[in-house]
Amino acid sequence: MRPPAFWFTPPDSPALAARLLAPLGQAYAAATARRLRAPGHRAGVPVICIGNLNAGGTGKTPTAIALMQRLAARGIEAHVVSRGYGGRLEGPVEVDARRHRAADVGDEPLLLAAFGRAWVARDRAAGVRAAEAAGAQAILLDDGFQNPSVVKDLSLIVVDAAVGFGNGRCLPAGPLREPVEAGLARADLLLSIGGPEAQRRFATDWPALPVPRLTGRLATLQMGMDWQGARVLAFAGIGRPEKFFASLRAEGAELLRAEALDDHQPLGEALMKRLEIEAMALGAQLVTTEKDAVRLPPSFRQKVLTLPVRLEFDDGAALDEALDRLGLAARS
């Protein structure tokens, strides 16, 4: 289901629907605040939470990949712990791409497992214990900023600079899981992801933030594929599929059709066969995201290309300093 447009009107001029739903949003915020008072498990290794204030996709997965690689470059073995949204396994279980499918562990953990060790656990504290017992020197919590079951040593809030915090209201009146002020008061760093214009707009709409702000962008990973003039039928079931379509256009691809699916939508044989027939009629190549690709039926994995992206920090000094303070300096 796509988010309603009124979630993203300016904070100082909310739509009528947002105003009518405001009491429910206030109740949601109060429930979140009560839940956060519960005590959490303290791990024996640093725990870094990659979270957000918005519901839906903001760029947490590429941020987790970037942090895994950054810590690996320091000689730190970091494990990711995720709830495994969309998967059937409760865990804790270590993700193994050789035997697990997205239906087992969720698409995001399956993708993250290609970059390091990843765990799925409905009970995050149990997942952290399992990762620590398996030798994790640091733990990355994929989401879970509003879940108190694990004590966080560093909380990094990720936001899509193009949409910011929307109208600044909590679900269902807006896109937020909790008020901006309350969330940032518990955070250590804010990462806004987007191009220069989106970053400028975010800075204007949300000035005087109480935490250090990092900026970054999602850059296409060059894999030797020349997209210039390529005729494609693109499909994506991520938080903001239009960003993926824009990336393809920026690479020079000719999008003959772009199909926005629901976030985490299953890619069954019937759906994929329909897309394949449409692509053949258009003389187009099927293309999707890395995260969607792990949900493809086996019979389509060789038929669909991906456009991988990686997070590039504009200046990661504040992040490096925070990692150093956690005792995660480079090791020989």
From Swiss-Prot:
InterPro entries: LpxK, P-loop_NTPase. ATP binds at residues 54-61. NCBIfam families: lpxK. It comes from the Bacteria. Its EC number is 2.7.1.130. It comes from Cereibacter sphaeroides (strain ATCC 17029 / ATH 2.4.9) (Rhodobacter sphaeroides). GO terms for biological process: lipid A biosynthetic process; lipopolysaccharide core region biosynthetic process. GO terms for molecular function: ATP binding; tetraacyldisaccharide 4'-kinase activity. The gene is lpxK. The lineage of its organism: Bacteria, Pseudomonadati, Pseudomonadota, Alphaproteobacteria, Rhodobacterales. SUPFAM superfamilies: P-loop containing nucleoside triphosphate hydrolases. Pathway: Glycolipid biosynthesis; lipid IV(A) biosynthesis; lipid IV(A) from (3R)-3-hydroxytetradecanoyl-[acyl-carrier-protein] and UDP-N-acetyl-alpha-D-glucosamine: step 6/6. It is an enzyme of class 2 (transferase). HAMAP family: LpxK. This is Tetraacyldisaccharide 4'-kinase. One of its GO terms (cellular component) is plasma membrane. It catalyses: a lipid A disaccharide + ATP = a lipid IVA + ADP + H(+). Transfers the gamma-phosphate of ATP to the 4'-position of a tetraacyldisaccharide 1-phosphate intermediate (termed DS-1-P) to form tetraacyldisaccharide 1,4'-bis-phosphate (lipid IVA). Belongs to the LpxK family. Keywords: ATP-binding, Kinase, Lipid A biosynthesis, Lipid biosynthesis, Lipid metabolism, Nucleotide-binding, Transferase.
